[in-house]
Amino acid sequence: MPKLRSATSTEGRNMAGARALWRATGVKDNDFGKPIIAISNSFTQFVPGHVHLKDMGSLVAGAIEEAGGIAKEFNTIAVDDGIAMGHGGMLYSLPSRELIADSVEYMVNAHCADALVCISNCDKITPGMLMASLRLNIPVIFVSGGPMEAGKTKLSDKLIKLDLVDAMVAGADERVSDADSEQIERSACPTCGSCSGMFTANSMNCLTEALGLSLPGNGSMLATHADRRELFLEAGRRIMDLATRYYKHDDESALPRNIANFKAFENAMTLDIAMGGSSNTVLHLLAAAQEAEVDFTMDDIDRLSRLVPHLCKVAPATPKYHMEDVHRAGGVMGILGELDRANLLHNDAYHVAGENLAAVLAKYDIAQSDDAAVRKFFSAGPAGIPTTKAFSQDCRWDSVDDDRQQGCIRSREFAFSQEGGLAVLSGNVAVDGCIVKTAGVEVENHTFIGSARVYESQDDAVAGILGGEVVAGDVVVIRYEGPKGGPGMQEMLYPTSYLKSRGLGTQCALITDGRFSGGTSGLSIGHVSPEAAAGGTIGLVQTGDRIEIDIPARSIKLAISDVELAARRTAMEALGNDAWKPLGRVRHVSMALKAYALLATSADKGAVRDTSKLV
């Protein structure tokens, strides 16, 4: 029978000092011997997705203590990618994922916690906590802060739905008046919560449901809705159940590596492709799989992308639907239910909400469940009242959206497309692959041939786009922005937004060894691997080269001869210490980021640390 990890610091005369310190935190005599449950909260006043999380730890702690455990909360950092974007702050976003993972490991192992509740929400926080959970392999459950309500405003007497990307595009579009731009800005992000579309934060919170590590509704229930309170309380109760199963009954199915196994990673990626999730999710799933010691690779993602249809289309791919609409249509369980009926899921995978995924779907998939409470749960809707408070409203839709022909979630027969929302491309530009969010690409752009316009940094690319250097037919190449070359693998939402604002959104392509915000749409190809700083071919592209992109064929090609490519590589290598470095780029890189770059791998490995360098 597994012994409580916390016994290391609570049992025996030699631990008198540790017990004295535990007592100083409020632990009583009759508490010793109970499981100690760590609550990793990511509350911060910097991030709208986290501004309402301050009291969530206490909520979860109360449920844990009622169920017979000891709850101890600590905090992690949380970077807001939207606020950090467009300047040097974005260099810190992806590296913060590793910092969060390490900080969770440090706190849990230093204090011998027995189990873990992860209160996350935004872009790098959920992945960082997921990596730590799978590294630690102790009972865990995730509960996120929930999505923001979609913005709404009237322009030209027409009610429109908005999100962060609309504000960014309008701000850079000279055709939009100052008054309209300000109105969009003030309306785009009305409440607390993670940005309202299928961007990275919401994509990752949805994927925790498919991985089996969070409760139904975690990815879609609005941050403002009163029903979300119960998710936090139930997370506290469930973690005690998981801890009891493992420590008292030796049930290893309660451990995260047995829940998030290969089948679960396939389920999560299948969901991701079906819902057109953020391309960043590929990066994070690959990283999490390595922590779980699961052999899940880009080859698996490529294979699944050819099988899975696009069943749910959400902003930024369409202005019609946001996360509040996904929830009304049955949330993640609604999408998984359709995938299950299409025989595309492993429904025998374990799940924290039930015996296995099949049992959870039987209750929570609105297309098959007749549970009135479940239908009421998915009727939770927005109030349209600006607020930073959680659980501040209890508005409901008149009915759920169970229209699988023309609704937000479709059956396979009526899919938005029979090919999914993400694809892996490869070719001489990206020998180890790259990622495109096909859900956001117009069909006429699925094949594209253009002339390369090369930039050594995101900043130079932005200047080129806004300065009129980039014209229709160009393939904008932004390199040395990968995990090592940036360092930090910046998101390229500003370049893509500015292309749209200049009317070039469907007239140009963009490829980069950096990455894209979940808010990106258009022919935007990221995660090019190997990255330029690691000797990738993208570092050899020259302005004027022809680049051929063919999404149906899953290919991306630099149209020069192998002889010419080899000659360019030889010339680059001849530069010695100056090889594979950006020409003329001026960028201050802090010591912390230099340390990150030393161990960073390219995106096809999830941009995790190359631990072989530590041997």
UniProtKB/Swiss-Prot annotation:
UniProt keyword annotation of Magnesium present: yes
Keywords on record: 2Fe-2S, Amino-acid biosynthesis, Branched-chain amino acid biosynthesis, Iron, Iron-sulfur, Lyase, Magnesium, Metal-binding
Cofactor: how bound: Binds 1 [2Fe-2S] cluster per subunit. This cluster acts as a Lewis acid cofactor.
List of residues binding Mg(2+): D81, D123, K124, E491
Active site per the UniProt annotation: S517
A cellular component term, taken from the record's GO annotations: cytosol
InterPro entries: Dihydro-acid_dehy_C (IPR042096), DihydroxyA_deHydtase (IPR004404), DiOHA_6PGluconate_deHydtase_CS (IPR020558), ILV_EDD_C (IPR056740), ILV_EDD_N (IPR000581), IlvD/EDD_N (IPR037237)
Molecular function per GO: 2 iron, 2 sulfur cluster binding; dihydroxy-acid dehydratase activity; magnesium ion binding
One Pfam family cited in the UniProt record for this chain: ILVD_EDD_N
Cofactor(s) in the UniProt record: [2Fe-2S] cluster; Mg(2+)
A biological process term (GO) from this entry: L-valine biosynthetic process
Catalysed conversion reaction: (2R)-2,3-dihydroxy-3-methylbutanoate = 3-methyl-2-oxobutanoate + H2O; (2R,3R)-2,3-dihydroxy-3-methylpentanoate = (S)-3-methyl-2-oxopentanoate + H2O
Tagged with keyword Magnesium: yes
Positions contributing to [2Fe-2S] cluster binding: C122, C195
This enzyme's EC code(s): 4.2.1.9
Coiled-coil intervals: none
Residue numbers of N6-carboxylysine PTMs: K124
Functional pathway: Amino-acid biosynthesis; L-isoleucine biosynthesis; L-isoleucine from 2-oxobutanoate: step 3/4; Amino-acid biosynthesis; L-valine biosynthesis; L-valine from pyruvate: step 3/4
Family: Belongs to the IlvD/Edd family.
Record's function text: Functions in the biosynthesis of branched-chain amino acids. Catalyzes the dehydration of (2R,3R)-2,3-dihydroxy-3-methylpentanoate (2,3-dihydroxy-3-methylvalerate) into 2-oxo-3-methylpentanoate (2-oxo-3-methylvalerate) and of (2R)-2,3-dihydroxy-3-methylbutanoate (2,3-dihydroxyisovalerate) into 2-oxo-3-methylbutanoate (2-oxoisovalerate), the penultimate precursor to L-isoleucine and L-valine, respectively.
Subunit structure of this chain's protein: Homodimer.
Name this protein carries in UniProt: Dihydroxy-acid dehydratase
Provenance organism: Shewanella pealeana (strain ATCC 700345 / ANG-SQ1)
Gene giving rise to this polypeptide: ilvD
